[in-house]
Structure formats: structure tokens, C-alpha cells
């Protein structure tokens, strides 16, 4: 249900049934080693396994291109799908939180931050602290997945490609 609500119908490969509910399991790695996972319930609630490492943890979706950092898994799927439609290469790092983006960015060559346009301004603040080029929805409260659902993959892709040209 969660991925369907985010515009990805039929994406069931990481779904586990548990106590009558469907849970999306997103692996988290540090240096290629599995350190835990993020569990996303049907209603979108998210949690990590008790006691697991989250610092520097990421999920990398690699297509041998520019490094792109984002917070969430659905956001990464929107970025991946939009850039694939534009025939662009990418290496997307799902960082699971804005604060963790700073840790993941260390040691990577410059790339593009896909910042959430949080009401609090956290996404943009962290993007500026990292110092890379960044893309952010022009609508407060939106992330790239929300933009994908509002304007479609083509418009999202064109906007992302314009930002990538600045990297």
C-alpha cells in the first residue's frame, strides 16, 4: 500500500507480510555491509530495528552516474524513474534523514542534493551546509516524490536534469 500511495504500483519486491500487515523493508548499508533496515508500514509510518546503526547508513541505487543524495526511499524511486526516462545516469544515495546526508556526503565527489522542502527548513539548511548544488520543490511541505505525483515524471525529470547541468 505504501508504494502504491507513492505512485509505484506493483513494486512488491521488498514487501513482507507481518501480523496481517504489509511492511516495506529497505536495507541500510555502511561500506557495502548490511547494518539494518528501515521498516515502512502500509500507513507510511517508519522505524528502524531496535539498536541498529543508522549513522552513515545508506541504500545506494547505482547506475554509474553523478552522486545524488536524498532522504527517503520513495523520493529515490521518483528520482530514479524520472532520470531513467530522461536517459540520464545516476548514483542515488538514500540517506534516511537530512542529518545523515551530511555524513554520507563526506568522502564523495560533489553531486546533487535532493532536499525536502520542509516547513522547518531543515532540508534546505542541510543542503546548504553540505555545499553541493541542490534541488528542492518550490512547494513547502513537498519532497521530490510529492512533486512527481503533482506534476508528473516528465516535469520532475526536466527539472532534475537542469539542476544536474550545474553539478
Regions found by a protein language model. Name each.
Residues 19-108:
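Phosphate-handling DNA/RNA-contact segment within nucleic-acid enzymes
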Residues 1-24, 163-167:
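TOPRIM metal-binding catalytic domain and adjacent DNA-binding surface shared by DnaG-type primases
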Residues 1, 9-12, 19, 42, ...:
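Glutamate identity and glutamate-enriched acidic tracts
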Residues 64-65, 77-167:
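TOPRIM fold recognition
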Residues 1-5, 49, 112, 144-147:
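Broad hydrophobic/π-residue packing in well-ordered secondary structure
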Amino acid at each position: 500500500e505504501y508504494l502504491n500511495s507513492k505512485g509505484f504500483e506493483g513494486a512488491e519486491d521488498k514487501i513482507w507480510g507481518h501480523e496481517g500487515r504489509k511492511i516495506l523493508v529497505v536495507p541500510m548499508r555502511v561500506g557495502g555491509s548490511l547494518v539494518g533496515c528501515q521498516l515502512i508500514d502500509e500507513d507510511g509510518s517508519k522505524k528502524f530495528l531496535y539498536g541498529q546503526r543508522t549513522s552513515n547508513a545508506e541504500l545506494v541505487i547505482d547506475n554509474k552516474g553523478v552522486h545524488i543524495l536524498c532522504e527517503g526511499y520513495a523520493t529515490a524511486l521518483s528520482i530514479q524513474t524520472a532520470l531513467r526516462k530522461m536517459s540520464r545516469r545516476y548514483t542515488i544515495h538514500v540517506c534516511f534523514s537530512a542529518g545523515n546526508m551530511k555524513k554520507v556526503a563526506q568522502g564523495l565527489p560533489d553531486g546533487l542534493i535532493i532536499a525536502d522542502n520542509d516547513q522547518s527548513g531543515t532540508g534546505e539548511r542541510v543542503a546548504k551546509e553540505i555545499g553541493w548544488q541542490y534541488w528542492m520543490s518550490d512547494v513547502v511541505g513537498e519532497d521530490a516524490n510529492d512533486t512527481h505525483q503533482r506534476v508528473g515524471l516528465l516535469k520532475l525529470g526536466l527539472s532534475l536534469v537542469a539542476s544536474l547541468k550545474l553539478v
